[in-house]
Amino acid sequence: MTIVGSRRSTAYGRRTAEALAAQMAIRGITVVSGLAFSIDGASHRGALEASGDTIAVLSSGVDLIQPASHRRLGERVVREGLLLSEFLPGEPARPHHFPRRNRILAALGGAVVVVEAAEKSGVLITVEHALDLGRDVYAVPGALDAPQSRDATH
């Protein structure tokens, strides 16, 4: 199950992603995400804290865990899960890498769950890829007036 969402999420969104990932992990479902800020990191943490499997797909080489604040989380994923990248070691994350990473995120999950996505969010690229691949896409309801929930609920 791929879990994606806004890098500018609310506390509710992060708690929800972590709890959802933990419940998936408890049920033996591998959690896939991108190791980015907010929803991605919360998803990996939730899966790991539940002693489940998680796959982190990077937009950089596997030796450059970005953001730097997720280095320890990334190291834990290496020990207890799988860190994956199509980019060569030493290659930093670049803006044009994110859509390529999102394609892999969509392909690896049997379905995609969106937890908060602001208008014009890159998350929607993952959703498009998932739909093209015939994957189910689910959106977690957020506060209807929150900007972070705008495209997740429409």
Model-found features: residue ranges?
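Glycine-biased, small-residue-rich flexible motifs in mid-sequence functional cores and linkers
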Residues: 1-154
